[in-house]
Amino acid sequence: MAQNDIGIDLGTTTIIIAQEGQGVVLNQPSVVAVDTRKNSVLEVGDKALAMVGRTPNYISAIFPLKDGVISDHTMTRELICRFVNQVYSSHMVKPRVAVCVPAAITGIESDAVVEAVVAAGARQVYLIDEPIAAALGSGIDITIPDGRMIIDIGGGTTDIAVLSLGGKVKATSVRVAGNHYDEEILKHVRNKFSIAIGQRTAEELKKKVACCPQKTDFNEMMEIKGRSLLTGLPVRVNVSTSDLYEPVMMLSEQIGTAAHQVLEKTPPELAGDIYRNGVVLTGGGAQLHGLTEYLSQELKVEVTVSPDPVNCVALGTAMSLGLGDKLETGFTDATPRIGRR
């Protein structure tokens, strides 16, 4: 693998870039701040995120990725170009780039990813399915005949796959993930407490307070501030773990059902491997309190969290460039699609 080759986890909420041997070299929010009067980009990443909810009307914060795929091609190209240029100098040889994508991505959606990465200066582009990247980045050897199951819960999608001999045996992708927890918590707080809160407050509640009820020893409380829907004035309320059970379980059950369906379709020998090896959770959503307990109960197997759930997809994506000949499915040289070599 060349020194400047990179792997990109093109996430709905965060873009992470890694290089094998160096680890994560960039971790930035997937957001662009745009001056709509001039149609010009002001900031990207952390600086753009700091503007969300605190800007004049003519400054718009754009999240150009939705549910794991590109929804705004121009802004995604801008993000990737700026971030890639941060990690390698313009005088260096153009990098080979591997990008992870949802397992159920369509041809049109994957073409959009490739076009954006080539516009950023890549000389060759490879696409790798997220569950495969997550397994590699978690230190799992998927090239041997031993069934492993990955549940990767990102910002926009949850990818579930059974892997063996370098490829996918069974897989599915559901559009239930971290952002959806934020949205449901925001709506639930609005309905239960008659208070309007922002997306960042909802995310903080998810990380610090939310929990599946199967984890009986967890009970936290957090004071939040927002705007009263009754008076229109600033107000503060305390939200407890039990207050959030309803939205948390509604979404967790959808992930559990999807995982159950994948297991039901898994060949018996591989199902036995999974019973022995357990299931590994990856992605930022894997850190939800009580989720391992709930999924263990639902799937009747041990469920554990990857040693580095947030970064493992990017790390595995970077690793894939040196393992391409050992990956049977889910790893594709996508450069020819757009006539580039």
Segments and roles (model prediction):
Residues 1-153, 161-279, 286-341:
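Nucleotide/phosphate-binding catalytic cleft detector across ATP-hydrolyzing
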